[in-house]
Design a protein with these regions (language model features):
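Sec-dependent, cleavable N-terminal signal peptides
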Residues: 1-21
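Residue-level detector of intrinsically disordered terminal segments
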Residues: 4-5, 112, 199, 233
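A short, polar beta-strand/turn micro-motif
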Residues: 17-72, 82, 120-193, 242-269
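Intrinsically disordered, low-complexity segments enriched in small/polar residues
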Residues: 26, 35, 58, 83-87, ...
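Tandem-repeat architecture and repeat-register "anchor" residues
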Residues: 68, 73, 79-81, 88-93, ...
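Charged, amphipathic alpha-helical scaffolding segments
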Residues: 87-147, 211-267
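Intrinsically disordered, low-complexity segments enriched in Gly and acidic/Ser/Thr residues
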Residues: 169-232
Length: 269
């Protein structure tokens, strides 16, 4: 059964590496960091099925910047339920006034802002965050995240504000239409009326999709039933065939500020 699963996984996720270890299907994906701020998402579980520790998910490596404080080292900024951010920085092990003290065990580890300790933070599959790379624009580098392929049939985000960070919780691309289900969502004639999925591109812009009400043309004079309730790329009047990429994050813009966004596992589907 596991061999069948890994074969299916490899076929679906051609851009991600996989192997079979013990009873687990494990893999990895890489993301290129080429700018200061990049939206990323965790696509794996720990090998025992639990959430991945932040230290194991993003160990210090080439291209990453350590620092004395949150304003000097690379950051991982995770949005909280109230719309704020929980911020971790990559420590150089120094602390105290002017970095007068040093803790070798802290050097190259992620620390919660305001603390001088190795953070004990778990990142569940689908956790989406900003990665702030101090040298990203001048010295691009690659982050590799490895772990176990999730076996849950779906993962759901709760929407309680206008803008929520979302990301694919699986190491395979998920069809935006058919692979993502929403409740409490608003359809509209244009991108300014319907709910949005805004996926960050490599150049720092966004591919923006809106939930269509099926209408198009001047003043919504035409109607396509097959488009009603489907995601459409901004500027188009067709149900998109695009997929949500692995390892990248996106903004979900909710007009009602309530509802859910559910990603369906393409491996177990």
């Amino acid at each position: 059964m596991k061999k069948l699963m890994i074969a299916a996984t490899a076929a679906l996720c051609a851009t991600v590496g996989f192997s079979l270890e013990s009873a687990n299907v494990v893999g990895y994906n890489t993301v290129n960091i080429t700018k200061e701020y990049t939206l990323l998402s965790i696509a794996f579980d720990e090998v025992d099925g639990s959430a991945i520790d932040i230290q194991k998910a993003f160990p210090y490596g080439e291209g990453m910047t350590k620092g004395l404080t949150v304003s000097e080292g690379d950051n991982i900024q995770i949005m909280t339920d109230d719309g704020g951010y929980e911020t971790y920085f990559l420590s150089n092990g120094k602390y105290g006034k002017g970095g007068s003290s040093y803790n070798e065990a802290l050097d190259g580890k992620w620390s919660l802002m305001g603390q001088n300790a190795v953070a004990d933070r778990k990142l569940s599959a689908g956790t989406t965050f900003w990665y702030l790379a101090r040298a990203g624009k001048t010295t691009p580098f690659t982050l590799t995240v490895a772990g176990q392929v999730g076996t849950s049939e779906s993962e759901t985000y709760t929407i309680n504000k206008q803008y929520t960070l979302i990301g694919c919780p699986y190491p395979c691309e998920v069809a935006i239409n058919g692979g993502i289900e929403v409740t409490g969502a608003t359809t509209g004639l244009t991108v300014s009326e319907g709910d949005n999925i805004q996926i960050m591109t490599d150049d720092g812009g966004y591919d923006t999709y809106f939930l269509s009400n099926g209408k198009y043309g001047k003043g919504g004079s035409s109607y396509n039933e097959a488009l009603d309730g489907k995601w459409s790329l901004m500027g188009q009047n067709a149900a998109t065939e695009d997929k949500f990429p692995v390892g990248k994050g996106a903004w979900y813009l909710s007009r009602s500020k309530t509802g859910t966004v559910k990603f369906i596992n393409p491996i177990t589907k």
